[in-house]
Curated annotation (Swiss-Prot):
Domain of life (superkingdom): Eukaryota
Name of the gene this protein is made from: FOMT5
Regulation of activity: Substrate inhibition by genkwanin (GENK) at concentrations above 10 mM.
Annotated protein name in UniProt: Flavonoid 4'-O-methyltransferase 5
Annotated active site: 241
Entries under Pfam families matching the protein: Dimerisation, Methyltransf_2
Keywords: Methyltransferase, S-adenosyl-L-methionine, Transferase
Organism phylogeny: Eukaryota, Viridiplantae, Streptophyta, Embryophyta, Tracheophyta
């Protein structure tokens, strides 16, 4: 091996060893609201201006921005800092809340993979580094707020992708139940885009009780393993990847019972892992999410096309279609 090749391999090894630094630094910038500050300012800002607006001292802010500029997150010209097309995706209205959720102690400490967890099938998410139950940790309250904000941001982005790239999904549909809707962000955005649709946000009673009102959306509390409100269509957005195959089949059967046999459909909005070598720009992201599921959810996973077909067949659906909405998720429409 020549010296240059060896040096390159060493550099790659160091990049892997320190790979956690980039998302950590980006999370710090989001926590300081740097993307929002630059976006709202409407133009480049000096270090002094950015320091005053963020409340972060100049020296550490300079070092943080230097790192993120090197990695292409922000831009700098004539000693002024500015947004890039990438950094705009980390504002509060985009993926900023998701970055903050990943930075909470409850998420960051336990979600790393370990050999022990892979051998035993034990979810690291339910244990802190001290071996205690993370859900009872005082930090969990903050984590749940961050989690809700992250899911809201994700729902907003995914609903926008559906509206933009697959509006035909709601042709002839008069009512839609969003199962596991939390505070109704996704169904609210869809009803706003397709005002003839009556939206039903369905989640556990204690969750919908805290939901703000949304025009065109009714909030219903219940348990998806017992029954699902009836509608022309049932939507499962980022729900089934949390559950085992058996539980998914149970959920899908309950959804099938809720729709008309002649015109109804179940819309699954979730990732599809590609194993055939032909992927798209989100293929790596989906594999990363599967690693998170491997560490976080003992039974959950991101599924391949064959695995989705198996679930649909076992749940009694006769046919299905798949639509690429140019997002991390696809829309799988299953028919009785």
């Amino acid at each position: 091996m020549v010296a240059d090749e060896e040096a390159q391999l060493h550099a790659q090894a160091w990049d892997h060893a320190l790979s956690y630094i980039k998302p950590t630094a980006l999370s710090a910038a989001v926590e300081l609201e740097i993307p929002d500050i630059l976006e709202n300012h409407g133009g480049p800002m000096t270090l002094s201006e950015l320091s005053a607006a963020s409340g972060c001292p100049r020296e550490p802010l300079y070092r943080l921005m230097r790192f993120l500029i090197f990695h292409g997150i922000f831009t700098k010209s004539d000693d002024c800092y500015a947004q890039s097309p990438l950094s705009r995706l980390f504002t509060t209205e985009n993926l900023g809340p998701y970055m903050l959720m990943q930075a909470t102690p409850v998420t960051r400490c336990p979600t790393g993979l370990s050999g022990e967890a892979l051998k035993t099938g034990t979810s690291l998410y339910l244990k802190s580094i001290r071996g205690e139950d993370s859900w009872s940790d005082p930090a969990y309250g903050y984590h749940m707020k961050a989690f809700t904000n992250a899911m809201t941001a994700h729902a907003r982005l995914t609903a926008a992708a559906i509206v933009r790239n697959y509006p035909a999904a709601f042709d002839g549909v008069q009512s839609v139940v969003d199962v596991g809707s939390r505070h109704g962000t996704a169904i609210g955005k869809l009803v706003e885009a397709f005002p003839w649709v009556r939206g039903i946000a369905f989640d556990l009673p204690e969750i919908v009780a805290d939901a703000p009102p949304r025009k065109g959306v009714d909030f219903v509390g219940g348990d998806m393993f017992e029954s699902v409100p009836k509608a022309d269509a049932v939507m499962l957005m980022w729900i089934l990847h949390d559950w085992s195959d058996d539980k998914c089949i149970e959920i899908l059967k309950k959804c099938k019972e809720a729709i008309p046999a002649n015109i109804g459909k179940v819309m699954i909005v979730d990732a599809i892992i590609n194993e055939d070598g032909e992927g798209d720009e989100f293929s790596g992201t989906r594999l990363s999410l599967d690693m998170i599921m491997l560490a976080v959810m003992a039974q959950g996973k991101e599924r391949t096309y064959k695995e989705w077909v198996h679930l649909l067949n076992e749940a009694g659906f006769s046919k299905h279609t798949i639509k690429n909405i140019k997002a991390m998720e696809f829309v799988i429409e299953a028919y009785p």
